[in-house]
Amino acid sequence: MADRSGDVPVISWRMSREARTTGKLGIDMDILQWMKGHHVFFDGGMGSLLQEKGLGAGELPETWNLLHPQVLVDIHKAYLRAGANIITTNTFGANALKYPSGGQWELEALVRAAVENGKRARKEYAWEERARGACAGEDDIPVFVALDLGPTGKLLKPLGDLDFERAVELYKEVICAGVQAGADLILIETMSDSMEVKAAVLAAKESCGLPVFATMAFDEKGKLLTGGNVESIVALLEGLRVDALGLNCGLGPVQMRSIAQKLLEVSSTQVIVNPNAGLPRSEGGKTVYDIDADRFAQEMETIARMGISMLGGCCGTTPVHIEKLVERCRDLPVERPERKHRTVISSYSQAVVLGKDPVIIGERINPTGKSKFKQALRDHDLEYILRQGVTQQDNGAHVLDVNVGLPEIDEPSMMEEVIRELQSVIDLPLQIDTASPRAMERALRCYNGKALVNSVNGKAEVMEAVFPLVAKYGGVVVGLCLDEDGIPETAEGRIQVAKKIIETAARFKIGPEDIILDGLCMTVSSDSKGALTTLETLRRVRDELHGKTILGVSNISFGLPQREIINAAFFTMALHDGLNAAIIDPNSEAMMRAYYSFRALSDLDARCGDYIGVYGNRQGLSLGATLSGKSGDLGGSKANGPGGTELAGGAGGGMSLSEGVIKGLKEAAQEAVKEALKTGLPLTIINEELIPALDVVGKGFEKGTVFLPQLLMSAEAAKSAFEVIKAHMDCSGQAQEPKGKVILATVKGDIHDIGKNIVKVLLENYGYQVIDLGKDVPPEKVVEAAVKDHVLVVGLSALMTTTVPSMEETIRQLRKEASWVKVMVGGAVLTKEYADTIGADRYCRDAMASVEFAGEVLGG
């Protein structure tokens, strides 16, 4: 068989009427060309079919690539006969964490065998088609072998213990083996962590030139485990320039419909929808799904008619499901996605669109003119920097500028560290503000989302340094309207520089929607016409270039007394003349008054709702009160006054214990608890401050207003406070016994322990002793641990369909040998109904539900 890495088939004999009547289109067409004018049909589930062929509970599916290759070839051919264009290799769980070097199985051999099985299936299928006269040979059928990459099973730092670069390496190992074996494209699927999918995409882009598709595992609310939503993920993946994006697994086609619609609304890239066959349940020890092939195809036709032409299946779907899907959808019109021309940046959890409604960029994380901030950088006082970010978020910023440029520090290292730490406690998008290309790349590589990049200008050497970074990592880049000749004195001169920036960016395939132009705000004290020139530039960018604009507003008043008066007036004028994003101090009462007033007067604030929300109650609401839905705060105080002065004191800064925990600030929580212990009783502090603060964050997590990074950082802050209290109680002879013991384990055959580890952190913070048995745990080991310590609660986790039988067997053995145990279960493949059928006492859809169940059984 010829090497297929660059020679891909082009003609479908069954995909569309056009293909059936026009004949061969040429053998040089690849998947990207094919999908422009044709439906693309993926295959369906693999694990459930392997189980039918004898894959045992806890057995590793990827080993069948070598042990039973004919089984894999037959499954692939069944999907091809059903009409699939893309067959995915049996490599979903293949990585060096699961198959370490020196182990029983060689990772490269498993991956190569998987690709070769797919290629063999394609070749044999082509022979069948040629025998019946449907094609001339293998090069006449549009069949592509996709190298399948699933999650590593680990949370990336700072949420977990897997380093980002290590994740990239793990994926590169698999990709290199798959590419050498002849894969046609890379399919990254079932991703629940935006940072992990970024690692996988970068690994693919840095290892090969194959097309890259990426699909995410959203819940019914359109959220990822780590907090991402549809808009933030689209921003990230389109910034990374994937060739198609979408969703798979976890949900059936009915539940996916609304998420698919949202994808269509915001994506300029082809959308993929690969649902499960409905929701799972257990029958006779086997996993079955509640939607049959006919119903599945009917629902998928509805999705196809929305404008989606890349369709397939995931868990529970079979060749019959795919055949019915192809029959109903192959002759539908193929719709290309419209280019949305949206200027959008994102964090891990939210997207900010720059357009009609002005955006506030907080300017306080910057050492310029701030002696305390400079000292914090020298002292490596990250908590001080985090406090600056938290305060700006509380006071209304939509984006935070991050500048750590100081000659005496290592700016690239500090920038990377500050970006990571800020994103662990704040969910706002960030603006990476640096003149150093090294610092810029370090920041862009570790950034979780699509960043605002500050900046590029019209100088050729600067554009050549910055644009390749934006093209590789994604981002919206600030274009300063200056060049080798300096800052033009006229608006016309600045517009000419802006045009040069836009034209040069196009060479790097960076569209005008990913450029935001800075008309340059000069101090009015030295140039009385400077403000008017800037305002004219704003209007011309808006009206002539149809572009987006940004300004560092406070530059206008440099050298003048009562600067806020000038700043606020100019800010309002600039907003009127088309300013889309303003770099200001959101802690400034005058600036925020100007902002909310302008929006209310410009029909940007429906019924003045935001204005009333801010100024109707002059005391406002703290973050904790907002999360809990109560007025008043939790005892904290504003860190900055109305003038936007620097934080007084160190990291603690007078913040209450509750506020420190809620905001995820460890040092602040430690300082607050030390102060509280001077006058309060340890148990009173725990029960009246620490636990209620955790409850506030937990309720926010359940409501979807707090996301996993914030939840875990709050847990870490609470843990640091608990350690101070424990040390105090140990010294005074008041040591407290844990509330009870809980066993946690990821079941045999499953290496994905993300959910288990999150549950562990929360249970420990609520005072329970956790016995963590790890991952890939045999049922006998769970039973042994439960009997040994007479543990009352056992928590079991499984991500993969193929490992749910292991969970059921573990529960069966617990019922036999440790009947007193209450079992809670969780994982992406489970539902309440499924948990009931395998004998669990409680299905826990998230970590907080596990805490609640432990409280019911053990008290507390």
Locate each region found by the language model:
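Domain-level signal for soluble alpha/beta catalytic cores
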Residues: 3, 9-518, 522-860
